[in-house]
Regions:
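A Zn2+-metalloprotease active-site environment signal
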Residues: 1-168
Length: 168
């Protein structure tokens, strides 16, 4: 799924096939809705633009090489913020699920399925050691936190708050 500026959420067919319950789909929608409510796309666009302008000003001449460096620097600069935004959307999305009295296990369950699917794709793509090394680098540069850490955080949030909001 993907949250767009302006409030639209794109849900891919594969996700609909992967979800076994309305609660799982609600978990994804709660997460994506938080990206919209918190204006994460707008913040990312502005941050990239500001980074590019700042580097161009500092370096003076923004020739083709500098344009490339500015672009790379902007992307690297936003990685930490993007990871932070993903965790924030997870946390706020789970809060939304709990307050709406929707079974919070749905969000945890769909994220577990997505993690398994990600691992399955990773294994099928990484047959050689060169591909494995490039995958490790890509993993480091990923804008999303590790699936394991996200699942652990969500599980803890359910344990801490389910008695207050959700009664299984």
């Amino acid at each position: 799924a993907l949250a767009l500026p302006g409030g639209n959420i794109i849900i891919f067919e594969g996700l609909l096939k992967l979800a076994d319950s309305p609660e799982e789909l609600a978990g994804v929608l709660a997460h994506e809705a938080q990206h919209i409510f918190l204006k994460h796309s707008t913040q990312g666009i502005l941050r990239n633009f500001a980074s590019g302008v700042l580097l161009a000003l500092v370096m003076g001449d923004a020739n083709a090489v500098m344009d490339g460096l500015v672009s790379i620097a902007g992307q690297i600069n936003t990685l930490g913020f993007s990871r932070k935004m993903e965790l924030e959307a997870d946390r706020k999305g789970m809060e939304l699920m709990l307050h709406a009295k929707i079974n919070p296990q749905g969000m945890l369950s769909i994220f577990e399925k997505l993690m398994k699917e990600e691992l399955r794709l990773e294994v099928s793509k990484n047959s050689s050691s060169t591909k494995k090394n490039s995958r490790k680098i890509f993993s480091y540069l990923s804008t999303h936190p590790s699936a394991q850490s996200r699942l652990k955080i969500l599980d803890n949030q359910i344990k801490e708050n389910s008695k207050k909001f959700w009664i299984p």
